[in-house]
């Protein structure tokens, strides 16, 4: 078995510690043709033989994962849909409101590496079942917190991160073990449609359930029931495919996992993974800020324009902007994800660097439109919505492509760990702190102006302009990814095919001549 610690295997000059990867453009031995470096893709019959699952069953598993992904994001942004009511109920300001999202993301970020480690080594189906069941109970409990205990709301939102971490680090790796090549890209695009659609449904459900029930607490009681359905679907429908078998094109046992520290070292030395994660961090910063603050900003804009009454203590706040922003998020997400995947798929045949270049174009293109949406808010709410629509469409082009990049530059036994640390990085520097940072800047700016509805609007307007600058930095990170993407992808392919192996820290090697080349094998395999 290629991944065994005791079986003999090649460790030639293409080992990362020994020399460059063959087939890399510009290096000796390179064909210069990216198509020739692509591994053979198994057909439907081959996939069924390797995974033990029919095409219909595999598609059904993806459908269940999409449902849960949609549910997770729906729950996350339900809070944003009723944020003005939460501020009134708990009597808190913008900075405290930003803490709601920051605490959730922080716990999610801390727990992600734990589930990443477990997901690379244990049954992924049962890990997700336990996490989502716990998340459903905690979410339901958060809807019964009295107004004088805001800290309890923060605590429960932090515990919700358990369910998110158990799912987000594991689900994409299941899809990677069911499909390959263009089929995997299509399935990932379907999976990541759930992010903007679920986010939009969260705004819509939060605002509409609040209006129907007359109490914002009921908005938090919708998703727990749907979470129970998700656990049942996971238990009854999802089956665990062998890790990495579809890429090795054989029914041999999957690659053996290496130590956690070896995984971390390999990921840190993978420039495509590191730079694409930094680019995705910028996406998380911008989307996290807009997710929490855009409806509140639009409401303040309407108040300044005289189109809606202000949100006063004791009154129910207008939810029309949450509804409209939710619809925009759904539409732009579907359009952006689909557009990004299709453009990348078409360009990939002629340019192997298409994926990071499309991501860079999306981020760099979204920055000026987001800036214009903020600048125009005091003059025309219609123009603001138009620019938000364009900016969010370009921003959404990244979701599925970034996931695809990770899956083909990281070997199967490290993917959950890679997903986890991409989550940690993107949230640590992205949406864990961005809602709080935006709220903090807004509060500080308001202190310098006389209290008024205009000063509340201007403070949030100026603080949100930081998003356009961060988006431009993210585009630069994706341009850097394009420099390394070909070599890193080829290295991962060679490793999966058993043609490239990393020397373990405790694995003594000897050199055996073979056809004029040195072949390194473990001492244990020779003694046996």
UniProtKB/Swiss-Prot annotation:
Coiled coil: none
Catalysed reactions listed for this entry: a 1-acyl-sn-glycero-3-phosphocholine(out) + H(+)(out) = a 1-acyl-sn-glycero-3-phosphocholine(in) + H(+)(in); 1-hexadecanoyl-sn-glycero-3-phosphocholine(out) + H(+)(out) = 1-hexadecanoyl-sn-glycero-3-phosphocholine(in) + H(+)(in); 1-(9Z-octadecenoyl)-sn-glycero-3-phosphocholine(out) + H(+)(out) = 1-(9Z-octadecenoyl)-sn-glycero-3-phosphocholine(in) + H(+)(in); 1-(5Z,8Z,11Z,14Z-eicosatetraenoyl)-sn-glycero-3-phosphocholine(out) + H(+)(out) = 1-(5Z,8Z,11Z,14Z-eicosatetraenoyl)-sn-glycero-3-phosphocholine(in) + H(+)(in)
Subcellular location: Lysosome membrane; Mitochondrion inner membrane
Domain of life: Eukaryota
Keywords: Acetylation, Lipid transport, Lysosome, Membrane, Mitochondrion, Mitochondrion inner membrane, Phosphoprotein, Transmembrane, Transmembrane helix, Transport
Transmembrane intervals: 50-70, 98-118, 127-147, 160-180, 187-207, 218-238, 278-298, 323-343, 357-377, 381-401, 421-441, 465-485
An individual GO BP term: lysophospholipid transport
This protein's record includes keyword Acetylation: yes
Pfam families listed in its UniProt record: MFS_1
Classification via InterPro entries: MFS (IPR011701), MFS_dom (IPR020846), MFS_spinster-like (IPR044770), MFS_trans_sf (IPR036259)
GO cellular component: lysosomal membrane; membrane; mitochondrial inner membrane
Region named Disordered: 1-49
Membrane disposition: Multi-pass membrane protein
Gene3D superfamilies per the UniProt record, alphabetical: MFS general substrate transporter like domains
Gene Ontology MF term list: transmembrane transporter activity
The protein's role, per its UniProt record: Plays a critical role in the phospholipid salvage pathway from lysosomes to the cytosol. Mediates the rate-limiting, proton-dependent, lysosomal efflux of lysophospholipids, which can then be reacylated by acyltransferases in the endoplasmic reticulum to form phospholipids. Selective for zwitterionic headgroups such as lysophosphatidylcholine (LPC) and lysophosphatidylethanolamine (LPE), can also transport lysophosphatidylglycerol (LPG), but not other anionic lysophospholipids, sphingosine, nor sphingomyelin.
Subunit field text: Interacts with BCL2 and BCL2L1.
Family: Belongs to the major facilitator superfamily. Spinster (TC 2.A.1.49) family.
Annotated protein name in UniProt: Protein spinster homolog 1
Species assigned in the record: Homo sapiens
Lineage: Eukaryota, Metazoa, Chordata, Craniata, Vertebrata
